Amino acid sequence: MVTKETPPQNLLNPYFSDPDKDYVYKANIDALGNKIGGLFIIKKLGEKTHRILFTTEMGNTLFDFSFQEDSFTVNRILKELDKKILINILKRDLKALVLEKPAVEQVFSKTNNRLIETNILSKKHYFYFDSEELTDIVRTRNGKAIVKHHFANIENDFAGQINITHENIQLKITLTALP
């Protein structure tokens, strides 16, 4: 039986919440048949501030974004990637990835599973929990999933593997934690 609950007051997404830690991942981005690989680094700089950097393995910056409260800043982006549509897609995907406490609209639970409906950048997102562990964030439109963030190899509030998959366009981002 599915029950409706009171919204939680604690962190929904703990994966990038430690300001003392640099989160470094090997990244592969597959977009419209083009593959880009490199290093993906996320750093929490303050209470509601994150910086996200994607570089080639040679150290060239592909993009460098900052999220602070409700603001988004493009610190640097490769000229070939400087397209408004791409920047907006990355902004939505990455905001959902690092936002720790989104505004909760509804909470549903069934046995060890919980589903939390939120609103991020005016888009409906669902946070899926299995035994209190965040496993997926899904953005929907008209009741259909259009973007899925899947977290795997989770240990001590750290996701060792993250896949961001778009259902409506050919875009997949795979992040694998480096030791």
Question: Where are each of the predicted segments found?
Answer:
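Short, well-ordered strand-loop elements centered on a beta-strand within folded domains, enriched
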Residues: 47-54, 71-78, 132-139, 157-163
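Mature, soluble, non-transmembrane domains
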Residues: 26-28, 85-179
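Amphipathic hydrophobic-ligand
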Residues: 34-36, 57, 61-63, 142-146, ...
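N-terminal leader/targeting segments and the immediate start of mature chains
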Residues: 1-38
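An acidic-aromatic
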Residues: 51-98
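N-terminal beta-strand/beta-hairpin edge segment
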Residues: 27-31, 36-60, 67
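Edge/loop elements at the starts and ends of beta-strands within beta-rich repeat scaffolds
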Residues: 16-20, 43-48, 67, 155-157
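Short, surface-exposed charged micro-motifs
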Residues: 39-42, 62-64, 126, 148-150
